[in-house]
């Protein structure tokens, strides 16, 4: 069973106005919720605020009195999900936040209508919006409430069902694994402890044993700012009993660390759970979970060697890797029916749908001119279909004769959409200087949402649109260079775009991307990757070889070494005249009255931090050279189609089926039934 919150609204619907992102409500439930079945007999109560008093009964047993709290009801809404040709289905349980009191009748009767429904509004705000902005106190409070609401309802539900079946929780850890997906559900740890201690009467040691043999943690990021830290005052205010338990866990863990590291605070402090008035959720996971896994081989090594190094030294058996995977039945068979038909013809009907490793059978067609030609025809047809959709939606006419060069993902500096833009500016400048400049025509497609409070990311979106407008207005670029920002990037758009894509931009700074799954979706649909050795790109390269991927840039250890020695982006600017011209163009602007001195300054001098933190200028020349190689390969359709076919053939290892088998074998310790 999977658990989450039944959000009414998604993160936001993106609108581009004058080149800038504007956030509008994205009404998820308004699309219809007929498949969500409310289970009113399984409603859970979640408590916020109030005060906690310690008490002891006549036999000296510790008891907790929690008073003055606010109650929010968690209403489960279940979606049943059928498997493909299996005898089983799974349940996705989404919790809907409701107030136990729809209206305060005494206030309503006295004419205080807004005040009368305030409690209802506050309760329902918990399941209102996915990822509310949290750069202010109210936003942080709401995020914390969302996380505790979600885990408290979930843990209570699991415990209730287990108790009904077995009559005891002593075997709880033998019947359940609770997989924490990133740090957002980390409060499941103290919540399970709370139930075992306060409601079931277990001793601390008994409760801790059950908890630490039940919960496992998947880490999804090495970015320090994404490893959640909560102000302790916030937890004290809204979750007083959870705070008490966290303090006890933290104190015991810190004592154990102090003993293990012989009082070395330089080791203890970074691993502490509560330190400097903050509660560090990732450290809590590493302390309490029986397994910690990264989501690509490189990512898991970085966790062991850097992010959680001392924890790894202390408990090496706790750490493992499970590389991410994607649902090939959705992202290939359903999204790309023409390609699915060709694969079924070559590999034996729907064999690959049950066994994605069967895609490897395509390799025997790598020199089959007929199959390669058909593969090229399918890609061309998908490009035309996508272009027709874009024209209907936006009025923009895509050049389908050019290579579709695609970068679609969350807008973040480490993902380096800006590096892509700098290269586009370079191409434009070369075209302006020499209209006969020889390069392979490109249609660049971007799709990205920036977090509402992430100012730099929003500026990069505006920059992309400024460059796109300049190129669209310049006749010299006609049929040679085009840039389009696809508004409101989302799953339904991705399902149309992936089958039409030809070059997949996976260009994050090496060592920063945990895994990525977009890279796998592109690969499975026959797009060739241009990328760094980062995240799952490393494993893609291992199965593809140098000949089927365009690699560039510094490796993760080289990035670390360069930063340690003192990276000076300005030297690259000074010594490379073409790069200098590109950066200088940011200061001048792109003909729409908007300049980007702030971005140029950030690259050359920093903006209160390190200049060019993600090493765009260091990787620029290597990136440009990789694009030249990609362009030359694209001009040879037979070679390109062979590369595309090899990408599809070797993508089976990145199917979610393999990923789930790895979790089942290495973490959950459950048998996997082989489908014949």
Give the label of every model feature segment.
Residues 1-676:
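A conserved ligand/cofactor-binding region detector
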């Amino acid at each position: 069973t999977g658990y989450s919150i039944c959000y009414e609204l998604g993160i936001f619907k993106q609108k581009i106005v004058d080149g800038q992102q504007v956030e509008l409500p994205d009404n998820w439930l308004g699309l219809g919720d007929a498949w969500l079945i409310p289970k009113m007999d399984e409603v859970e109560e979640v408590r916020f605020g109030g005060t906690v008093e310690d008490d002891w009964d006549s036999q000296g047993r510790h008891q907790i009195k929690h008073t003055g709290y606010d109650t929010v009801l968690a209403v489960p809404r279940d979606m049943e999900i059928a498997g493909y040709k299996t005898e089983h289905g799974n349940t996705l349980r989404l919790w809907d936040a409701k107030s136990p009191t729809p209206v305060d009748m005494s206030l309503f009767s006295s004419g205080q209508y807004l005040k009368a429904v305030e409690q209802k509004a506050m309760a329902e705000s918990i399941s209102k919006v996915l990822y509310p902005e949290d750069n202010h106190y109210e936003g942080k409070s709401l995020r914390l409430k969302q996380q505790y609401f979600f885990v408290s309802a979930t843990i209570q539900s699991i415990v209730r069902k287990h108790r009904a079946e077995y009559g005891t929780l002593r075997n709880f850890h033998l019947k359940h694994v609770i997989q924490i997906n990133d740090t957002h559900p980390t409060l499941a740890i103290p919540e399970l402890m709370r139930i075992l201690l306060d409601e079931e009467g277990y001793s601390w040691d008994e409760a801790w044993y059950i908890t630490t043999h039940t919960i496992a943690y998947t880490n999804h990021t090495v970015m320090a700012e994404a490893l959640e830290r909560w102000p302790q005052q916030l937890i004290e205010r809204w979750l007083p009993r959870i705070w008490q338990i966290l303090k006890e866990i933290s104190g015991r863990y810190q004592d154990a660390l102090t003993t293990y590291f012989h009082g070395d605070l330089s080791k203890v402090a970074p691993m502490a759970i509560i330190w400097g008035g903050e509660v560090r959720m990732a450290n809590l996971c590493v302390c309490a979970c029986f397994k910690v896994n990264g989501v690509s081989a490189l990512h898991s090594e970085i966790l062991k060697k850097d992010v959680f190094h001392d924890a790894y030294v202390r408990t090496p058996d706790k750490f493992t890797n499970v590389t991410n995977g994607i649902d090939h039945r959705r992202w290939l068979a359903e999204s790309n029916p023409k390609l699915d038909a060709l694969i079924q013809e070559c590999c034996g009907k729907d064999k690959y749908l049950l066994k994605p490793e069967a895609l490897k059978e395509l390799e025997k067609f790598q020199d089959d001119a007929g199959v390669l030609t058909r593969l090229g025809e399918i890609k061309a047809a998908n490009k035309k279909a996508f272009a027709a959709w874009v024209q209907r939606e936006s009025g923009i006419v895509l050049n389908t004769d050019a290579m579709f060069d695609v970068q679609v993902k969350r807008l973040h500096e480490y993902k380096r959409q800006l590096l892509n833009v700098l290269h586009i500016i370079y191409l434009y400048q070369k075209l302006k200087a020499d209209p006969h400049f020889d390069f392979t025509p490109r249609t660049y497609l971007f799709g990205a949402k920036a977090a509402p409070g992430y100012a730099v990311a929003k500026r990069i979106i505006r920059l992309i649109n400024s460059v796109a407008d300049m190129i669209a207005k310049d006749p010299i670029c006609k049929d040679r260079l085009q840039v389009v920002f696809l508004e409101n990037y989302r799953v339904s758009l991705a399902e149309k775009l992936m089958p039409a894509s030809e070059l997949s931009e996976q260009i994050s700074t090496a060592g920063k991307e945990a895994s990525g799954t977009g890279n796998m979706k592109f690969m499975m649909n026959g797009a060739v990757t241009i990328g760094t050795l980062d995240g799952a790109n490393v494993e893609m390269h291992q199965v593809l070889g140098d000949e089927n991927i365009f690699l560039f840039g510094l490796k993760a250890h080289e990035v670390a070494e360069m930063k340690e020695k003192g990276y000076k982006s300005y030297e690259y600017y000074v010594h490379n005249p073409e790069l200098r011209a590109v950066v200088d163009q940011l200061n001048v602007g792109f003909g729409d009255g908007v300049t980007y001195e702030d971005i140029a300054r950030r690259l050359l001098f920093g903006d209160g931090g390190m200049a060019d933190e993600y090493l765009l200028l260091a990787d620029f020349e290597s990136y440009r050279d990789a694009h030249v190689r990609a362009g030359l390969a694209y001009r040879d359709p037979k070679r390109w189609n062979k590369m595309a076919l090899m990408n599809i053939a070797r993508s089976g290892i990145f199917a979610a089926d393999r990923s789930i088998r790895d979790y089942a074998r290495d973490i959950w310790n459950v048998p996997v039934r082989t489908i014949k």
